[in-house]
Design a protein with these regions (language model features):
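ATP/NTP-dependent adenylation/nucleotidyl-transfer catalytic domains that generate, transfer
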Residues: 158-160, 218, 243, 267-308, ...
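Enzyme catalytic cores with a strong preference for nitrogen-chemistry domains
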Residues: 1-305, 316-325, 332, 357
Length: 557
């Protein structure tokens, strides 16, 4: 009979909501009870799972910190009857007079991103995160002190004969925290996480954690959040690696899961979920983001303008997958420039997905606006002013329906348009949530094709194949105002996500005139983007929390 100890560990992949201490605590307790019933001895809940991530300036409110402390104690009491079970919970920790972590600093209260060990009805120990990310969407140094300011350099907890070292997210991306845990006797590394999704992030995580496992010679368990929080999506995919960095277990992506992993000091074993395709991950992120933003904020449903174009068609498809057809309403608002095929395709799409579809002509309102402004505009030709009036009339109609019925307006503009300002302030930009804000136009087409390939074909073929147009004047197409989307999106990728300058982008083979124009448009339209609704982040550089450029600036790379 083998003398090698074996412990069942549960990775409690929950969908937390910021500020819902009771609800999040209940999810942690429920997951722990379910895991205990399956023989687990150790349960890992994600980073800041108790309060949700990111809590932002809630952390600066004393009442919030006090409530978090009380909720943690409450979880410990709720789990007291589960004999021998150890639960690790992520939460914010305020060091006060009754704190169980003593500060090396003098006469100041410190706030930490922490992980506490709950067992036998009490909070037995607390570890404080050492490495605080302060890039992209992260602002942790604004809120937290480093665990280096505590007297506990590492936390190792013995469960079932195995010593588990506790780390928090960014800690595992650096050498020192893991080495401190190993020096303290850890035989397995446990990393609790709140790591926002972007395309390619799961592979990046697994590669970095595999390198950490190999460097330390220790298995590594990675517990992660799932679900949406404002513009951020957490993709789940919690996993377990053996000491050689091989994946031995992986939870489902983009949904709550409880992964039970059999762990020894060298090996891990559990169910390994597949990794979806890039398109499937992008789709799941959009669906998750819409569903959780709408549901967590208590909206009864969504409303959007359906134009017969590909962007609004894709948003409609996402919304139906996220919420169900009964909670989605779309409105076609034709103008004198709306092609008959746009009407036909919009109605066809709405019928295919089974949503409520209404038509409201903007012609009477458009004519009234032009008549009211005729004296002021006398002698001046029609231009973008009249085009923008149409977009703003549509926004007024959608917002009126939103006010009357309570549904939130989904905007339908994409990242390529948002970058270049090819959108109307207080027009098509008006709404509560921008589904495609981080989806470039070329990816819009890929996702439309992917969605149809899953069957049944819900986006009419002509919507995908016809040239895109705002239909705000006769015979208008997007390419009259913008470079081809393949060129535009390649420039955006290099300029936004890779931080390349104009000369580097031109050297890569992209036309100088287009590069100069697009980068200028990005700069001069910053004021527009500041007034846009938030939208789902799916790349590692989105217009939102991780794009913080000044509006007034003379610099252009």
């Amino acid at each position: 009979m083998s003398d090698v100890p074996l412990v069942k560990v549960a990775l409690a992949q929950i969908n937390a909501t910021v500020g819902d201490l009771a609800g999040n605590g209940a999810k942690i307790v429920a997951a722990a009870r379910k895991a205990y019933a399956q023989g687990a001895q150790l349960v890992l809940a994600p980073e800041l799972a108790l309060c949700g991530y990111p809590p932002e300036d809630l952390l600066l409110r004393p009442a919030f910190m006090s409530a978090c402390a009380a909720a943690l104690e409450g979880c410990a009491r709720e789990l007291a009857d589960l004999e021998g079970l150890v639960v690790v919970v992520g939460h914010p920790h305020q060091l006060g007079e009754s704190g169980d972590v003593r500060s090396k600093s003098v006469a100041v209260q410190l706030r930490f991103n922490a992980a506490s060990v709950l067992t036998e009805g009490r909070v037995a120990a607390t570890y404080c995160k050492r490495e605080l990310p302060n890039y992209q969407v992260f602002d942790e140094r604004r809120y937290f002190a480093s665990g280096r300011d505590s007297e506990l350099p590492a936390l190792v907890v013995k469960v079932g004969g195995i010593a588990f070292g506790i780390l928090i997210c960014e800690d595992a991306w650096f050498d020192e925290p893991a080495e401190l845990a190993r020096a303290a006797g850890a035989e397995v590394l446990c990393v609790i996480n709140a790591s926002p999704f972007h395309l390619g992030k799961l592979a990046e995580r697994e590669e970095r954690m595999a390198a950490r496992a190999r460097a330390t010679g220790l298995p590594l368990l990675y517990a992660h959040l799932a679900g949406g929080q404002d513009e951020i999506v957490f993709d789940g995919g919690s996993f377990a690696l053996d000491a050689a960095g091989r994946v031995g277990a992986r939870a489902a992506m983009f949904e709550e899961d409880l992964a039970i992993v059999e762990v020894t000091p060298r090996s891990v074993r559990g169910i390994v979920a597949d990794i979806p395709s890039v398109e499937a991950q992008a789709w799941a992120a959009l669906v998750t983001g819409v569903r959780d933003y709408v549901d967590k904020n208590g909206f009864p449903g969504v409303i959007l303008g359906l134009s017969g174009g590909i962007d609004s068609a894709l948003v409609l498809a996402v919304a139906v997958d996220a919420l169900g057809a009964a909670r989605v309403r779309c409105v076609m608002m034709p103008s004198p420039y709306t092609a008959s095929i746009s009407w036909i395709d919009a109605r066809d799409m709405a019928e295919r997905v089974g949503v409520r579809y209404d038509e409201i002509s903007i012609l009477p309102m458009f004519e009234a606006f032009k008549a009211s402004l005729a004296a002021e505009f006398a002698g001046r030709p029609e231009d973008a002013t009249e085009e923008n009036i149409q977009a703003r009339i549509r926004a007024t109609l959608l917002m009126a329906l939103s006010n009357k019925f309570g549904s939130i307006v989904l905007t339908t503009g994409n990242k390529s348009e948002m970058a270049t300002g090819y959108c109307t302030l207080y027009g098509d930009m008006a709404g509560g949530f921008a589904v495609l804000k981080d989806v470039a136009k070329t990816l819009v087409y890929r996702l439309a094709e992917w969605k149809n390939a899953q069957g049944p074909e819900i986006i009419p073929r002509r919507i995908i194949t016809r040239p895109p147009s705002a239909e705000l004047r006769a015979d208008q197409t997007d390419q009259e105002s913008l470079p081809p989307y393949e060129v535009l999106d390649a420039i955006l990728q290099r300029y936004m996500e890779d931080d390349q300058g104009i000369e580097e982008i031109v050297a890569a083979g992209l036309p100088r005139a287009d590069v100069e124009r697009v980068t200028r448009l990005i700069k001069v339209n910053e004021y527009k983007r500041r007034q846009a609704p938030i939208g789902i982040r799916i790349t590692h550089r989105a217009f939102g929390r991780d794009w913080r450029y000044p509006i007034t600036s003379k610099f252009r790379a």
